[in-house]
Structure formats: C-alpha cells, structure tokens
C-alpha cells in the first residue's frame, strides 16, 4: 500500500496520525545524530591535523612522567615525548632497563631524564615518597598512566589466584590513583605559573577494550579497567578549570610483552604505531564518539568501538557471549601449549 493511501486510510484517526508523525521525526533525528557521529569519526581518524604539543610545553624545558616506561607502549611514550622536546621521568620496576632507556633518550634527543625504580604491585609507601621526591620541583605538564597488568592467561574468576587478583587491582587502580595524586598537583601548579601563552596540562590513562566491554575470563582485569574509565572521566571534569586535559585511552590488542602478541596485523599495531596515533589524536574522541574525555585513537580500534556502540552495544548479552567464547578458546589453547612445554621439559630431564 502506498504511503499516501495509508495516511488517507487513517485520516480520521488523529492518534495514529500523530504516532506516524512522531515515528518519522524520531527516525529523522536518529539518522541525523548517527550521520553526525559517523562524520565526526571519519574526521577524527583520517582528516584532523595532529595535536600541537606546544600547548603542553613541548621544547620549552617541561617534563613528562611516564609509568610502565621500561617496555612496550610505555617505552614508546617516553621516546616520542622526548622527540617532541620533553624531559622524561621514567617510572618502572627494573632499574637496569630504565638506565639503558634513559641513556638512549638523552643521547638521541638531548633532553634530561630521571629514573624512579617503582614496583607498583607492592603498594609500598616508600615508592610513592621516592616518586614525590623525584618530581616535586620539576615543571611537569604531562602524566602518562601506562603501568598495568592483566591475567597471565584467561581464567574464570573463581579460579583466579589471590596474588594475581591482588596485583591486578593494586597496579591498575591503587598505584594509578596514588601516582596521579602526586603528579597532578605539580601539573596544575606548572600551568598556573605565568607564561607567554596559556600552558595546558595533560593526563593520559591507558584503558582497554577489556574495560569497555565486560570480559568473562578476564573479570578482575576488566573490572579494573572499567573503574579507570569512570575515574578518569570524573577527574577530567574536576581538572577542566585548572587547564588540565584528562583522557582515557582505549585500545584493543597491541603487540607487546603484556599482550603476549608478537605479530602485528591490521587490527594489532606495534607500540610505535599505537602511541603515534594516540599523541596525534589527543583531544579527539575518534572511536569513542559517545564518551566524555575518552579516546579510541588507533583507526581500526576506533572503527570497532564505533561499530559495537552503534549495533549490539557494549553491555549486551550477545557481546558478553562472544567475549566469553573467545576467551574460553584462548584459555584452552594456552593450557594445551603449557602442557606441551611441560612434557617437552620432562623429556629433557
């Protein structure tokens, strides 16, 4: 039946006519909102210029604090920020690794470095005092909250070892909050001081698809990253008036020691590719179009995030089930590999 005939049929029924008009207007509104979000996504990923870090004090004697700086993504943040002209405070567990990285940064980029050997799993007050002593008199404008830990392999929550559970919560949440409480006031103080142009501060905290979507078999890790999402957005609201930009950076998989993935692919960048996209996209939402103070910067991750948000949704039953099946499969393969290695070791003995 043509639409005009349909309307004529119900011309005397005002309730149905109003319902039809409302449905049409709602459809136009939804389509317009989706189109604007999709246009913003494409602009953010492919067309927007790279962020100018001069507003954060690049090449002007300012400092950046990078946690988890000895490997992977954290190490890459340190190198790329040093390349932009920031001196770097390197915070991580292993002193010897930090010393090598500091030497390379100073030699290659002619900036200063400081080292803080810091085991985030211990929640030791001496660690925090050591960090505070290292940074209290520095003009810090950037904090990269990169330190983190996941499960060794996907595991049901009821079978999670107590130490692993405690370490994940302590490293991902407690240490991140305590470090931010130490460094953020210094950032606020630095950008408050008179400058030729208004400086801004920046706090980036590493999130994860594991926090975006509730993830069975990574329940503790997933919960810790979800906590960071809410905390970071709340902190962003608090520090806006202090000229400090706060963002949660969401990633899917990145080839690194933590992910145990060695090969890159279209959806799995190496740390250099991921950090480049993150720093270039500071201030833009990319794939996180519906989320305040949040970015999913790497282009394939951004498209995946946008697609999930605009189809099944992150809290849907189907998303949870697919996540469960994927991590059950990963666990089975990991256990088989461990069994093969154990059998091979027994043969050698």
Curated annotation (Swiss-Prot):
Assigned EC number: 1.1.1.330
Catalytic activity: a very-long-chain (3R)-3-hydroxyacyl-CoA + NADP(+) = a very-long-chain 3-oxoacyl-CoA + NADPH + H(+)
Any one GO biological process: fatty acid elongation
Pathway assignment: Lipid metabolism; fatty acid biosynthesis
One of the record's GO molecular function terms: ketoreductase activity
Family: Belongs to the short-chain dehydrogenases/reductases (SDR) family.
Name listed for the protein in its UniProt record: Very-long-chain 3-oxoacyl-CoA reductase
Species for this entry: Candida albicans (strain SC5314 / ATCC MYA-2876) (Yeast)
């Amino acid at each position: 039946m043509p639409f005009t005939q349909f309307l004529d049929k119900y011309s005397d029924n005002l309730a149905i006519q109003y319902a039809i008009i409302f449905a049409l207007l709602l459809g136009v509104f939804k389509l317009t909102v989706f189109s604007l979000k999709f246009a913003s996504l494409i602009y953010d990923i492919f067309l927007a210029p790279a962020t100018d870090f001069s507003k954060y004090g690049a090449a002007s004697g300012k400092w950046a604090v990078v946690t988890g700086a000895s490997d992977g993504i954290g190490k890459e943040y340190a190198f790329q920020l040093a390349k932009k002209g920031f001196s770097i405070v390197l915070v991580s567990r292993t002193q010897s690794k930090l010393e090598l990285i500091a030497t390379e940064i100073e030699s290659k980029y002619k900036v200063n470095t400081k080292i803080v050997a810091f085991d985030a799993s211990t929640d030791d007050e001496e660690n925090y005092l050591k960090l505070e002593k290292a940074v209290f008199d520095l003009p810090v404008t950037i904090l990269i909250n990169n330190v983190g830990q996941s499960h060794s392999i996907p595991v049901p929550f009821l079978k999670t070892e107590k130490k692993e559970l405690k370490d994940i919560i302590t490293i991902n949440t407690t240490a991140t909050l305590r470090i931010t409480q130490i460094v953020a006031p210094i950032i606020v103080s630095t950008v408050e001081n008179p400058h030729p142009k208004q400086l801004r501060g920046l706090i980036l905290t590493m999130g994860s698809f594991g926090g975006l979507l509730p993830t069975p078999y990574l329940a503790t890790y997933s919960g810790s990253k979800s906590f960071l999402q809410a905390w970071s957005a709340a902190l962003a609201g608090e520090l806006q008036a202090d000229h400090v930009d706060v963002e949660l950076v969401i990633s899917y998989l990145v080839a690194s020691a933590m992910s145990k993935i060695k090969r890159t692919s279209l959806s799995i960048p190496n740390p250099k590719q991921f950090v480049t996209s993150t720093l270039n996209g500071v201030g833009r939402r990319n794939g996180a179009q519906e989320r305040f103070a949040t970015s999913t910067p790497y282009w394939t991750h951004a498209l995946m995030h946008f697609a999930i948000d605009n189809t099944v949704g992150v809290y849907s039953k189907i998303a949870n089930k697919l996540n469960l099946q994927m991590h059950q499969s990963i666990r089975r393969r990991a256990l088989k590999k461990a069994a093969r290695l154990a059998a091979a070791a027994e043969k050698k003995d």
